[in-house]
């Protein structure tokens, strides 16, 4: 769950990442061992982004390492993914999102609809945005009760939560 002020921060960070990196799609996903939920996205509604990047984001969060894919059509993680086969995601760069204590929260990822060679500078910018985001939100603060509108519930296995602007 996120507080409304946190949601505004998340949305600003995803929009900032899109502008700074010049990409059409950005996703901020909170990822658990068996599930993930896109907390904020730019370029596409969150439910679509979750379907597009879930496999990649889980790998980044689990490994606590970045994942950089220049052309997912030729990458073992992406070649058989419907989003890649349909041309919705071709290039992907994702970094883990850590809280101030070093705990893994999820991922911040950027995607493109065409092959893209990610530069060192772009990856450093992505890391910078993720670092600032991880330190800008008080992850231990109480979240809004589930009964409040536009809330975010902790995801259950196999179920994402729609983006507030979608419902």
Features from the language model and the residues they span:
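PAS (Per-ARNT-Sim) sensory domains
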Residues: 106-107, 123
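A short, aliphatic-rich beta-strand micro-motif
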Residues: 90-99
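Regulatory sensory and allosteric helical modules in signal-transduction proteins
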Residues: 25, 31, 35-41, 46-90
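Short beta-strand-to-loop transition segments that serve as allosteric relay/switch motifs
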Residues: 107-116
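Short hydrophobic/aromatic beta-strand element in the GNAT-like acyltransferase core
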Residues: 25, 94, 107
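Intrinsically disordered, low-complexity terminal regulatory regions
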Residues: 1-53, 123, 127-129, 136-145, ...
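Glycine-biased flexible loop/turn sites that connect beta-strands or occur in inter-domain linkers
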Residues: 28, 102-103
């Amino acid at each position: 769950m996120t507080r409304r002020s946190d949601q505004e921060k998340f949305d600003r960070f995803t929009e900032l990442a899109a502008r700074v990196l010049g990409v059409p799609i950005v996703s901020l996903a909170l990822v658990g061992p068996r599930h993930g939920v896109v907390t904020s996205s730019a370029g596409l509604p969150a439910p679509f982004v979750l379907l597009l990047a879930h496999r990649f984001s889980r790998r980044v969060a689990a490994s606590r390492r970045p994942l950089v894919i220049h052309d997912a059509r030729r990458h073992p993680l992406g070649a058989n993914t419907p989003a890649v086969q349909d041309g919705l995601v071709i290039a992907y760069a994702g970094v883990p999102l850590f809280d101030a204590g070093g705990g893994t929260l999820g991922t911040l990822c950027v995607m493109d609809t065409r092959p893209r060679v990610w530069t060192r500078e772009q990856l450093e910018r992505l890391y910078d945005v993720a670092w600032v985001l991880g330190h800008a939100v008080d992850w231990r603060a109480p979240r809004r009760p589930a009964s409040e509108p536009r809330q975010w519930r902790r995801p259950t296995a196999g179920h994402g939560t729609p983006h507030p602007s979608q419902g």
